[in-house]
Amino acid sequence: MAIEKSADHSTVETVHADSADVAADPRAKSALVSDNVFEHQQTVRQVIFGHPVLIWWSFFFSVSAIGWGFDAQVNGAVLSIPSFRRDFGEQYDGGFVVPAPWLSAFNSISSVGQFFGGFLCSTIADRVGRRLALAVGVAITCGGIFGELFSTARAAFLISKLILGVGLGFYLTIGPLYSSEASYVQYHDLRIMSLTRSQQVSPVVLRGITTAGVNLGIVIGQLLSNAAIRGFGERGDKWAYRGPFAIQFFFVAFLAIGLPFSIESPWYLVRRNKIDEARTALQRLYGADTNIETKLVAIQMTVAQDLAAKESKWSDAVRGTNRVRTLISCGVFVCQHLVGIIFVLGFSSYFFQLAGLPTERSFDLGVGVTACGVVGTIISWTIVNRLGRRIIFNSGMAILSTINLLIGILDVVPTRGASWTQAALTVVWAFFYQVSIGAVAFVLLGETSSPSLRAKTTAVATATQAVFGIVMNIVLPYMVNPDEGNMQGKVGFVFGGLGVIATVLCYLYIPDLKGRTFEEIDLMFDIRVPPRKMGGYVIEH
């Protein structure tokens, strides 16, 4: 590795050695420090306008998250379409309902497919690259969508949802992973998997904003889904539900057309020891004005550290102080389910109809719920670094639990216009959810997890979220379906009560790590500072 001083911010290295050799070179460590200092000095404006190619390809791969959000929302929203209930349901009390067992299966099978699709994707991505792995995911997703469109029996529709879920598992893994790897320290994007790398090296001032943005792609997909339901749902034929399914082909086509022109992840190329190809990829992503060699050294250094970190065991995540860190990382996503995320966002339109609102109005309110979610997500970017993580998350839990209880009370003590009031409270719930725990959960995951165990902790958090999602999707149909529990608004008592318990635990365990470096966070956990006191703890340097 030849090294010489540049006239700008850092040292220039011409890299030819493999990652292990670079990691052992003290000059490489100096280059890494120099590059890190420069990154911390950059502003958001400089990042966005200085690297348009990088921003574009990060956005391109992140379209997969919008596709995931669309499917996640359409799963529950399609139940509000009368023709879907007619074709896949049974007659009940003068109408049609999908039996609760099948309803549970339809809603949960996609999560099962995503669980296995994620593991399959990671294996393929490490062997053949991120671009080809996403291409495989696009092909599988395409097959699942075709199955949804032309299924006429419940079993066939269920299998199609499973296949589609596997493809979406690829989306959940590759899209965010590519975005975080390609941008590496400057721009990070959607979904939990991206936190493994982007949180570890992102500037402190941007860390909260970038990870809070994890919700944006998802809620945009949810908004588009409800808009499609609104546009097609009142048709009397099969295209009332086939139309929203067919719109998913847009995301498939967008990715399929752009993939041949996309740039392979430089992180993958370095891991495969394809240094020259990695250099070319970095040059295309960052442009001629960026010190590419320094970034290449930084990637090689991190890859070498990752290889050393493989010696850690899964059991380390629940040992010593890591136990609390892992519980917090997973607990923030459990809280989302305990306050009713699946019920409010997944079953909102169906719930509105069960509450007695006209079909057309239920579709309008479904769009309103997700539109408020988009606004809430954007607002969260402006407050996450001003108010801090703890106050936003805990206040959100308290507000959401209260709203759930109010929805339940309105069902027990019916008043004139109670149905509309419940619907309005649901819209308000969606707004406060996205402003608070919807966005901040991803920030807390990246900040509280131990750097040496971040990949493992992230995997555990992802699995925990998936398991709770499957459970809720199985249980909820039995709670709300007219031929089963028919609880209607009384479901608010269930999630309100669970939310109150979770809020108490959040008061004890949710930390505020705003503005803290990872070294400071490690120190506070190591000396066992109570999480609720970390925000005001003074560290003597």
Segments predicted by a language model, with ranges:
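Alpha-helical transmembrane bundle of multi-pass membrane proteins
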Residues: 2-287, 304-541
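Short, well-structured alpha-helical segments
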Residues: 292-304
